[in-house]
Amino acid sequence: MSRVAKRPILIPEGIKIELNLQSISIKGKYGYLSRIIHDAVKVECLNNKITFSIRSGFSDAWAQAGTSRALVNSMIIGVSKKFSKKLQFSGVGYRVSLTKGNIVNMSLGYSHPIVYSLPPYIEAENPSPTEIVIKGVDKQLVGQIAANLRSYRRPEPYKGKGIRYSNEVVHMKEAKKK
C-alpha cells in the first residue's frame, strides 16, 4: 500500500486548480499544465489541499494513487518555480551556443555541427561556451530534452569527454596496460 498517496498536497498561493472528472488543470505564474488522472484514483480539492484516495475494483489502485500524487505535486512545483537541468560539455573543442528561435548549436568533435531545435515552451540559457541550462514547467519534458542533448556525446569512461549533467559523476577506467 502506498504511503505517498495518503499525504495531502498543500496548494501554494497564486496557484489555480481545476478538477473536471478525471482531469486536473494547474495554472501558476510560469505556465499551465493539465493531466488525466487514472480511473482508480479519486481526487478532491478542499481548503487549499488536494487529497488522493482510491476507488474499489482496481488491484493497483494505491500504486496509481501514489503515482498520481507525485505527478500532480511535480506539476504544482513546475508552474510555481520551474525545473532546470544543467549540462556541461567537457572535451577539446566541445562547445554549445544558442541562436534565436530556441536553436542549440553543438560542436562535439564530429565533422559537422549538431543543430537541435527546442520546443517553444522550453527555455535555455548559455552561461558559458561549455554549459547549457534547460528550463521549463514540465519536469518530464525538461529531463527528456536534457537526455536527448546528452545522447549526442555521452561521457566516455577513459578520458571523461562528452556531455554530462552538472551533478553526474563519471567513473573513470584505467587504460589497458601491456
From Swiss-Prot:
Any GO molecular function: structural constituent of ribosome
Domain of life: Bacteria
SUPFAM superfamilies found in the cross-reference section: Ribosomal protein L6
GO-annotated cellular components: cytosolic large ribosomal subunit
PROSITE patterns: RIBOSOMAL_L6_1
InterPro entries from the UniProt entry: Ribosomal_uL6-like, Ribosomal_uL6-like_a/b-dom_sf, Ribosomal_uL6_a/b-dom, Ribosomal_uL6_bac-type, Ribosomal_uL6_CS
Keywords: Ribonucleoprotein, Ribosomal protein, RNA-binding, rRNA-binding
GO annotation terms (biological process): cytoplasmic translation
PANTHER family given in the database record: 60S/50S RIBOSOMAL PROTEIN L6/L9 (PTHR11655), LARGE RIBOSOMAL SUBUNIT PROTEIN UL6M (PTHR11655:SF14)
Subunit field text: Part of the 50S ribosomal subunit.
UniProt family annotation: Belongs to the universal ribosomal protein uL6 family.
Job description of the protein: This protein binds to the 23S rRNA, and is important in its secondary structure. It is located near the subunit interface in the base of the L7/L12 stalk, and near the tRNA binding site of the peptidyltransferase center.
Protein name listed in UniProt: Large ribosomal subunit protein uL6
Gene that encodes the chain: rplF
